[in-house]
Amino acid sequence: DMDGVLFNSMPNHAESWHKVMLRFGFGLSRDEAYMHEGRTGASTINIVSRRERGHDATEEEIKAIYQAKTEEFNKCPMAERMPGAYEVLTKIKEEGLIPMVVTGSGQTSLLDRLNHNFPGIFKKELMVTAFDVKYGKPNPEPYLMALKKAHLQPNEALVIENAPLGVQAGVAAGIFTIAVNTGPLPDQVLWDEGANLLFPSMPAFNENWEI
């Protein structure tokens, strides 16, 4: 996963969702935004719309809200590299494993940003983004697509996730899934989604890599 694992970008996403939904007359707390991490924008908007109005948002509403959310997010300072992430990726490479990014993001500058922060780690053909899949997390499709791209079986891979929906997707794909709780949610939320291991941070995961 990228947001919340490689980059400390989730506070910006949560704040942007909270502000913009309020502007459009909806209630979405920052903590709830973390619960929806990994969903498509339309799915997040419709969950709140159904809860508060009893029906889905219109296509026009979804477009307007998501555009406003993107603009709000782009005003935020650039997210820093998550502490410990580079060290974990270096160990992954040293072990002869293949590092891949599986993200719901569709930013066109993604590879440039990854290469700038994690030089020599990722290859474009070994990335799964919003453009590669029809269904977002919690559907297992993004992780199944990653296995297909790398020519791997589920028992030959590891998933590293911070989001409940991402953990759910990894588990549903049949992959050993490690949760790293870099956000404000209780650990139990990640355990409940089926995480096989859980660490409180990327540095903690790095220190226990040999496990």
Predicted regions and their residues:
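Active-site neighborhood of HAD-like aspartate-dependent phosphohydrolases
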Residues: 2-32
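Conserved phosphate-coupling serine/threonine residues in phosphotransfer and NTP-handling enzymes
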Residues: 5, 103-105
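An amphipathic alpha-helix signature
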Residues: 14, 18, 41-46, 107, ...
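Anion (oxyanion) recognition and catalysis
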Residues: 22, 93, 171
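Short helix-capping segments at alpha-helix termini
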Residues: 23-26, 53-60, 118-123, 151
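A metal-dependent, Asp-based hydrolase signature
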Residues: 38-72, 83, 91
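Short, acidic loop-to-helix structural element flanking the phosphoryl-transfer center
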Residues: 74-101, 108
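Asp-based, Mg2+/Mn2+-dependent phosphohydrolase catalytic module
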Residues: 86, 90, 106-211
